[in-house]
Curated annotation (Swiss-Prot):
Residues 499-514 have a biased composition (Polar residues). Residues 291-325, 343-353 have a biased composition (Low complexity). One of its GO terms (cellular component) is ciliary basal body. InterPro entries: P-loop_NTPase (IPR027417), RABL6 (IPR040385). GTP binds at residues 50-57, 100-104, 177-179. It comes from Mus musculus. This is Rab-like protein 6. Residues 707-725 have a biased composition (Gly residues). PANTHER family: RAB-LIKE PROTEIN 6, RAS GTPASE-RELATED. Residues 410-427, 537-549, 632-649 have a biased composition (Basic and acidic residues). Its main location: nucleus.
Length: 725
């Protein structure tokens, strides 16, 4: 039976296994499982008894909240279920088990196949779960006795069974089939008279009579309230058991107190002796850790002003030879029951090998251990052994005052840190250095285990500093702009960002040859709306002469500045290529005239290929500054070569330059021809590599005069930087 009950109140079985549950058993409701999972305080058992066909199973279903079934299906075995019920509005979790009891069960063997023959002996051999097999009143808290008011023999069953009910169990006699009252044969007065005259011993439980109808749920509310009596009775029994347990606990405690009164713990003289013995037993192990067991002082009272940062550093341990007498005279705040100082060194000396693995120390070393004793704190228990304890014992005895005493590395340095007395630094510099964990060791040599304020370089500091370089303006390249040109550059568009020099530095010698071509570029590309147009036009003859007489020491400053002013004044300069190179620029110093002007210079007479040095320019079609080259490149190259060879024809050159400026303004309107101009510019750059170097020596004086005239490039250019590299 108990195994069946465990299966009943256990976890719900899978739906596929419901068919395997034997008769009389069922799975528990999910809501009940969640409620009972928190813990059940009371288990109440209600038994429904009665003759056949009196409505026991109908009541059992109704208590579960199920519907009423008209047809009669005889119950073969006892059925048990749990229902929702609680006493009024209390929070007590009550598990109510309702038993549908069958007096005589019939267990039928269920076979998989068809029944072929009758075998009554086999059927009788199996036991059924019924009232004959179980004692249904065991641990029962309430009984519902049912009968049919239309059948007399059902009431006779009640008359037979009521005397068998235990006297302490409350009983509710329920007359069912109240909906068929016109056919009733048992009157309510007959039942009440029988209950009143029932012979029950005094102190027995209660009997109540009620009528019900399972068809229309009449009487269920009364029955629901009747369950309060079994519950309150169960609660009283539980409380009585708790009271009994409480009384037993009181008696046991009184007996323990009587025994405790006679023990040694209640004898004061014995208690004092035990305390003294315990204090002597704990003296030596605690002294090794730097504590005095009988006294509450764990470190000497040292004025904070007597300790400086340098003397409190872990690198300068200072022993105190005469500290034992000084501390005893200058520390009245320590508790009085301190052992005598004569007995203290002996106890400390006996436990000295624990913190310091050195051999037996000398008397001078013993005093240093005493200083070590008073200098330690509870923190010393965590790290009892310093890395180098030996130098502390061998240090000379020079401290003459308690104010000069410095505790050892057991104390927290921040506790006594003060910078008011700088004289301790002299004494601190003489002691050997020791490693420690404190952060005050920067006074002498720094503590390797503690980082400084900014020892680690943040990654953000490096990335920000590097990313800001390409966005710097051009004056960082030793190229200055006039005030007019700077105004145009700021009003028109952003300044030119430094461009990355993608050529190797090993081929820099070729740029010395290309200096004359660099000077010629501004004369061709300067727009007519530039403010510096008159200055550029007035200097055209000198530039024509510079092509022939420029030397390797040519400063290149004026031409570079003019080229830069032209580029910054050009509204069509904002190209994708320039934006890409502005983002890619990593070496802003590399931005020099070689990158600025070689791709925009006018075409020159192609020298013999044998004189060409190693290729320095890029082999791509890209125009760094987004400037369109004219289709008249070959014609201009021939004209400019003729002009460079004939420096006397300056007027003709001015006319040519004005014509080129007009062509430049027309070309800016048609940007779709830039790709074709880039190809021509690439061919022209290959032709202009080698100008005559013998004519470069004549340009120094004229460039100085040109610089003195207030040219925009008065500052020394960055070409010298490349030569130095």
């Amino acid at each position: 039976m108990f195994s069946a009950l465990k299966k009943l109140v256990g976890s719900e079985q899978a739906p596929g296994r419901d068919k395997n549950i034997p008769a009389g058993l069922q799975s528990m409701n999910q809501a009940l499982q969640r409620r009972f999972a928190k813990g059940v305080q009371y288990n109440m058992k209600i038994v429904i008894r009665g003759d056949r066909n009196t409505g026991k199973t109908a009541l059992w279903h109704r208590l579960q909240g199920k519907k009423f079934v008209e047809e009669y299906i005889p119950t073969q075995e006892i059925q048990v279920t749990s229902i929702h019920w609680n006493y009024k509005t209390t929070d007590d979790v009550v598990k109510v088990e309702v038993w549908d009891v069958v007096d005589k069960g019939k267990c039928k063997k269920r076979g998989d196949g068809l029944k072929t023959e009758n075998d009554p002996q086999e059927a009788e051999s199996e036991l059924a779960l019924d009232a004959e097999f179980l004692d249904v009143y065991k641990n029962c808290n309430g009984v519902v006795m049912m009968f049919d008011i239309t059948k007399q023999w059902t009431f006779n069953y009640v008359l037979r069974e009521l005397p068998k009910v235990p006297t302490h169990v409350p009983v509710c006699v329920l007359g069912n089939y109240r909906d068929m009252g016109e056919h009733r044969v048992i009157l309510p007065d007959d039942v009440r008279d029988f209950i009143e005259h029932l012979d029950r011993p005094p102190g027995s439980s209660y009997f109540r009579y009620a009528e019900s109808s399972m068809k229309n749920s009449f009487g269920l509310k009364y029955l629901h309230k009747f369950f309060n009596i079994p519950f309150l009775q169960l609660q009283r029994e539980t409380l009585l058991r708790q009271l009994e347990t409480n009384q037993l606990d009181i008696d046991a405690t009184l007996e323990e107190l009587s025994v405790q009164q006679e023990t040694e713990d209640q004898n004061y003289s014995i208690f004092l002796e035990m305390m003294e013995a315990r204090s002597r037993g704990h003296a030596s192990p605690l002294a090794a850790n730097g504590q005095s067991p009988s006294s509450g002082s764990q470190s000497p009272v040292v004025p904070p002003s007597a300790v400086s940062t340098g003397s409190s550093s872990p690198s300068t341990p200072q022993p105190a030879p005469q500290l034992s007498l000084g501390v005893s005279s200058t520390c009245p705040s320590a508790p009085s029951p301190v052992p005598s100082l004569e007995a203290m060194p002996s106890s400390v000396h006996s436990s000295a090998p624990a913190p310091t693995p050195a051999p037996a120390p000398a008397p001078a070393q013993r005093r240093s251990i005493i200083s070590r004793l008073f200098g330690t704190s509870p923190a010393a228990e965590v790290t009892p052994s310093p890395p180098e304890p030996a130098p502390a014992l061998e240090a000379p005895a020079r401290v003459q005052n308690v104010e000069d005493f410095v505790p050892e590395d057991g104390l927290d340095r921040s506790f006594l840190e003060d910078t008011s007395v700088p004289k301790d630094k002299k004494v601190g510099a003489k002691g050997p250095q020791q490693d420690s964990d404190s952060d005050d060791g920067e006074a002498l040599g720094g503590n390797p285990m503690v980082a400084g304020f900014q020892d680690d370089v943040d990654i953000e500091d490096q990335t920000h500093g590097k990313s800001l370089l390409p966005s710097d303006p051009m004056p960082s390249k030793n190229i200055s702009l006039s005030s007019e040109e700077e105004a145009e550059g700021l009003a028109g568009h952003p300044r030119v960002a430094p461009q990355q020099c993608s050529e190797p530095e090993t081929k820099w010698s070729s740029t010395k040859v290309s200096h004359p071509q660099k000077k010629r570029a501004p004369t061709r590309g300067t727009p007519p709306w530039s403010d510096g147009l008159t200055t550029d036009d007035s200097e055209r003859p000198q530039e024509g002469k510079d092509k022939q007489v420029s030397s390797e020491s040519d400063p290149e400053g004026p031409i570079a500045a003019q080229m830069l002013s032209f580029v910054m004044d050009d509204p069509d300069f904002e190209s994708d290529e320039s934006d890409t190179q502005r983002r890619m620029g990593r070496f802003p110093v590399r931005e020099d005239l070689s990158d600025v002007t070689d791709e925009d210079t006018g075409p020159a007479q192609p020298p013999p290929p044998s004189k060409l040095p190693g290729a320095f320019r890029l082999k791509n079609d890209s125009d760094l500054f987004g400037l369109g080259l004219e289709e008249m490149g070959p014609k201009e190259s021939s004209d400019e070569d003729r002009d460079s060879k004939l420096p006397s024809k300056e007027k003709k050159k001015k006319k040519k330059k004005s014509k080129e400026e007009e062509e430049k303004t027309t070309k800016k309107k048609s940007k779709h021809k830039k790709s074709k101009d880039k190809e021509e510019g690439k061919e022209d750059r290959k032709k202009k590599r080698k100008p005559p170097r013998s004519k470069e020596q004549k340009a120094a004086d004229e460039l100085e005069a040109f610089l003195g005239g207030g040219a925009p490039g008065s500052r020394h250019p960055g070409g010298g930087d490349y030569e130095e590299l």
